[in-house]
Amino acid sequence: MHLKGRSMLTLLDFAEDEIKFIVDTALQMKRENYAGRRYWGLLEGRHLALLFEKPSTRTRVAFEVAASQLGMSVSYVTKSDSQLSRGEPLKDAARVLGRYVDAIAARVKRHEDLETLVEHSGVPVINALSDKFHPTQAIADVMTILEKLGRVRGVKIAFVGDGADNVAHSLALAATSLGADVRIVTAPGYEPLDAVIAAAEERARRSGGSFELVYDPCKGVKGADVVYTDVWVSMGLEAEREKRLRDLRPYQVNSELLKCVGKDYIFMHCLPAHRGEEVTEEVLESSRSVVWDQAENKLHAQRAVLALLVP
């Protein structure tokens, strides 16, 4: 399957078979990496720009390591240390970066800024997190589910917390594409974007999976194979902190809520975790938690995305 030259702003732009191909490639590259068969030099001579407007630990380092492993060189640029901080239009910066580099991975406050980069740079742009989507995280998430449970089709995934979260959006699109039964367990007013709901329902219909919104936290996690949460106060939403903590408190993933599952399950979190808010220390550090393996898979997912998209 040929994906060279494509951008990845959202998984809405990728068909179900393309998402499966990316996940399968990431798993294959991970296995071969551990077997000593490396992909060093696959993108020798290419250059990646990391254009980050928000802080990052895992995503930034994973892109830097993945690019290096593939033979790429990397330039890390933040808004504060570039002319963007002095008012240079993003489209002007995009025009120049597109003449210097072979691809851009960008972490932005406004998803629309990614579209500006695509329009004016002329090179593949990869969403390293926006206010609406986090597609490379979803690739890592599906990888983790496949590794831990052996399948995605028919797996019951309960995402608990802020249903309008960028990770929730991308997970719903990726998992329903591969036949999972996805529940977004959230409070009224925190539902996913209408476009995400419509796309997830359509993908679930085609794949044999399902998608639903559940407002009761105990009912939402009942029978789940995967219980997943993310922070309640995403970057840029700090002004809403107290309201969000109050509204989402009943959706904390703790030992009491997990009694409602009633079966074996795994716990997932994209990190960083705010212990005592969306999840308790006990759950995060439990034997059912796979968050550290999940975090490692960000490296393998992002390496596959670079290998497949960068010309």
Swiss-Prot record:
GO CC annotation: cytoplasm
Signal peptide location: none
Keyword list, A-Z: Arginine metabolism, Cytoplasm, Transferase
Coiled-coil region(s): none
Stored InterPro entries: Asp/Orn_carbamoyltranf_P-bd, Asp/Orn_carbamoylTrfase, Asp/Orn_carbamoylTrfase_sf, Asp_carbamoyltransf_Asp/Orn-bd, Orn/put_carbamltrans, OTCase_ArgI
Amino acids binding carbamoyl phosphate: 56-59, 83, 107, 134-137, 270-271, 298
Enzyme type, top EC level: transferase
Sites where the protein binds L-ornithine: 166, 230, 234-235
One family name in Pfam for this protein: OTCace
Listed GO biological process terms: arginine biosynthetic process via ornithine; arginine catabolic process to ornithine; citrulline biosynthetic process; L-arginine biosynthetic process
PANTHER family registered for this protein in UniProt: ORNITHINE CARBAMOYLTRANSFERASE, MITOCHONDRIAL (PTHR45753), ORNITHINE TRANSCARBAMYLASE, MITOCHONDRIAL (PTHR45753:SF3)
Biological function: Reversibly catalyzes the transfer of the carbamoyl group from carbamoyl phosphate (CP) to the N(epsilon) atom of ornithine (ORN) to produce L-citrulline.
Family: Belongs to the aspartate/ornithine carbamoyltransferase superfamily. OTCase family.
Record protein name field: Ornithine carbamoyltransferase
Organism of derivation: Ignicoccus hospitalis (strain KIN4/I / DSM 18386 / JCM 14125)
Gene this protein is translated from: arcB
